Amino acid sequence: MTTLERPQPKLSMADKAARIDAICEKARILPVITIAREEDILPLADALAAGGIRTLEVTLRSQHGLKAIQVLREQRPELCVGAGTVLDRSMFAAVEAAGAQFVVTPGITEDILEAGVDSEIPLLPGISTPSEIMMGYALGYRRFKLFPAEISGGVAAIKAFGGPFGDIRFCPTGGVNPANVRNYMALPNVMCVGTGWMLDSSWIKNGDWARIEACSAEAIALLDAN
């Protein structure tokens, strides 16, 4: 589909960048959630929210991802719910229909970038190289997920990207932990981080929601001390 043939969204790319900014700056931490059991959807979200984390990235890494987005949008409207691990246009359409308020990808293809341009829902595409940034930049993207952050150069890489890409901001994800999160958040071109250290699989499996709540609160306190 050519640019002239493509339906034009109501929101400009600048509008969608501003929406991503608002979501990420309010959240600061995006928990990257994979739902293994449908019965965990609400208690897990409630534990995170009680600890101060109210913006959630629900991945499509399990069969319950779409259902989780639908349930949370319907039953926890006070939360901001996005979709992660969106790999192609059909998955983008599915999470859009499920009610996702933002979309995150682990990497980029021309098709997924164009899906984000066409959609009213803001897309945070995953990149790890300058060439990938330029591919998104050409289509109007100014906000990216750096993934996997630590393996891709971490804090040093984000600082380096700030030279040629002064108007770009990042959500580093992958390897972000209590020991380095403040280093990331101190960077002017970082708007939030994606992580999962408060989502220990054994805690979720055992229904240890109090521990998840406490760990979430500790994460927020760590950022407040920055």
Curated annotation (Swiss-Prot):
<feature type="active site" description="Proton acceptor">
    <location>
        <position position="57"/>
    </location>
</feature>
<feature type="site" description="Plays a major role in determining the stereoselectivity">
    <location>
        <position position="173"/>
    </location>
</feature>
<feature type="binding site">
    <location>
        <position position="61"/>
    </location>
    <ligand>
        <name>pyruvate</name>
    </ligand>
</feature>
<comment type="similarity">
    <text>Belongs to the KHG/KDPG aldolase family.</text>
</comment>
<comment type="subunit">
    <text>Homotrimer.</text>
</comment>
<comment type="pathway">
    <text>Carbohydrate acid metabolism; 2-dehydro-3-deoxy-D-gluconate degradation; D-glyceraldehyde 3-phosphate and pyruvate from 2-dehydro-3-deoxy-D-gluconate: step 2/2.</text>
</comment>
<dbReference type="InterPro" id="IPR031338">
    <property type="entry name" value="KDPG/KHG_AS_2"/>
</dbReference>
<keyword id="KW-0456">Lyase</keyword>
<dbReference type="InterPro" id="IPR013785">
    <property type="entry name" value="Aldolase_TIM"/>
</dbReference>
<protein>
    <recommendedName>
        <fullName>2-dehydro-3-deoxy-phosphogluconate aldolase</fullName>
        <ecNumber>4.1.2.14</ecNumber>
    </recommendedName>
</protein>
<dbReference type="GO" id="GO:0008675">
    <property type="term" value="F:2-dehydro-3-deoxy-phosphogluconate aldolase activity"/>
</dbReference>
<dbReference type="InterPro" id="IPR031337">
    <property type="entry name" value="KDPG/KHG_AS_1"/>
</dbReference>
<feature type="binding site">
    <location>
        <position position="85"/>
    </location>
    <ligand>
        <name>pyruvate</name>
    </ligand>
</feature>
<feature type="binding site" description="covalent">
    <location>
        <position position="145"/>
    </location>
    <ligand>
        <name>pyruvate</name>
    </ligand>
</feature>
<keyword id="KW-0704">Schiff base</keyword>
<comment type="function">
    <text>Involved in the degradation of glucose via the Entner-Doudoroff pathway. Catalyzes the reversible, stereospecific retro-aldol cleavage of 2-keto-3-deoxy-6-phosphogluconate (KDPG) to pyruvate and D-glyceraldehyde-3-phosphate.</text>
</comment>
<dbReference type="Pfam" id="PF01081">
    <property type="entry name" value="Aldolase"/>
</dbReference>
<dbReference type="InterPro" id="IPR000887">
    <property type="entry name" value="Aldlse_KDPG_KHG"/>
</dbReference>
<keyword id="KW-0119">Carbohydrate metabolism</keyword>
<feature type="active site" description="Schiff-base intermediate with substrate">
    <location>
        <position position="145"/>
    </location>
</feature>
